[in-house]
Regions:
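Intrinsically disordered, low-complexity N-terminal extensions of AAA+/P-loop NTPases
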Residues: 1-135
């Protein structure tokens, strides 16, 4: 499946990985600001619609993809976004939602601070497919 998004009045085909990469690039040191969200709007909306998740969850998922696939934690996310860890912990419910969608998994059931990207998610992205299509 190839996805199409509009960019500067031109249609541009973009894979899911390309959209994730763009969000990662634009989100670095962004503090998830409105300016960043506006710049990455097309990619964020594409991913949100594809995975059935919120825009904030898209950003967190993309950062986890960049920092993973193994042993991602709240500090990694905070460092990438240039936020303090407490602010990122405020988005724990979004991380939980990504777990529910099976886009992330806890590294250890006893430790909810570390998480991984499941191999099946990475494999599906390599083929530009959406893992766990939800209605």
């Amino acid at each position: 499946m190839s996805t199409t998004i509009r960019s500067n009045s031109k249609k541009k085909k973009m894979t899911l990985l390309q959209a994730i990469e763009r969000v990662v690039e634009l989100s670095e040191d962004s503090k998830m600001s409105q300016e960043f969200m506006k710049k990455a709007k097309a990619e964020i909306q594409l991913l949100a619609k594809s995975y059935g998740i919120t825009e904030r969850q898209v950003v967190l998922f993309c950062v986890c993809m960049e920092k993973g696939p193994n042993r991602v934690d709240y500090h990694d996310i905070a460092s990438h976004l240039d936020m303090n860890k407490i602010s990122v912990l405020g988005h724990a419910s979004d991380i939980d939602a990504l777990m529910h969608r099976r886009l992330l998994k806890y590294r250890d059931v006893k430790d909810e601070d570390d998480f991984d990207i499941p191999a099946v998610v990475i494999r599906s992205l390599k083929h530009n497919e959406i893992w766990g299509r939800f209605s």
